[in-house]
Amino acid sequence: AVDMTYAAFDYAQQDRNPVLILSDGVMGTIMEPVELPPERSAEEVRALKEQCRSWAAIGHDSYKEPRATIDAGRWDTKEQERHCKKAEELYKSWPSEAETLYLDDAEVVVTGYGICGRIARSAVKLLRAEGCKVGLIRPKTLYPFPSDVFAGLDFVRVKAILDVEMCIPAQVVDDIRLAVTDRCPIETCLHAGGEIMGRDEVRSEERRVGKEC
């Protein structure tokens, strides 16, 4: 979470586009030791400021150069369409990110985002210690969604995917279905309304899914 928050500012400045940090309530309240990225030098900070001098409203001599403007759209429809195509190319350039574990021999793949991703990772490591052939996909970006990671699974071996979410009804399961395209069953392990997911629940659901598939 710390690394992604740090990177969000770079992405926002690079593309002049808002970046949403989708932290959940648990991630926003826990305390734990973290390792911060290296501090940038004064020269690096000056270079970053200089990059945005031509377009940002920095408060000094901004009247001397045209600044970025925001409007509802363009009256010329062809120009608006060109702008939309340019934006599409920008969106395609954004990398998707996901943490993966033990996918080389997994028969059941557990997935979760936010705090559920961390809980799922802990459960998967315990299950592996018990001899279960289980893997993990933990999406770090939800847009773009790491569809290629799900689509690239070996569906001859993978019997099912278990989606862990603190959300009822599940939301990310729809993105998973689009990536998997009915090549294996997708089960859910859900909580909502303030109920916190536990790793023992995830372990129990994984065992159930593994037996049924």
Please state what every model-predicted region is.
Residues V164-K211:
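Peripheral docking tails and interdomain loops at the edges
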Residues Y6-Y11, L36-E39, S122-E130, A151-F155, ...:
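Short, solvent-exposed amphipathic alpha-helical segments in soluble enzyme
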Residues R16-T100:
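Conformationally flexible catalytic loops at phosphate/diphosphate-handling active centers
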Residues M4-Y6, I30-P37, S41, V173-D175, ...:
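Short acidic, glycine/serine/threonine-rich loops at helix termini
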Residues Y6-A8, V110, R138, L162, ...:
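Buried hydrophobic positions in well-ordered alpha/beta secondary-structure cores of metabolic enzymes
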Residues A1-G25, G198:
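Conserved thiamine diphosphate
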Residues T100-C132, I137, Y143-V149:
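Redox- and metal-dependent alpha/beta enzyme cores, enriched for Fe-S-associated oxidoreductases
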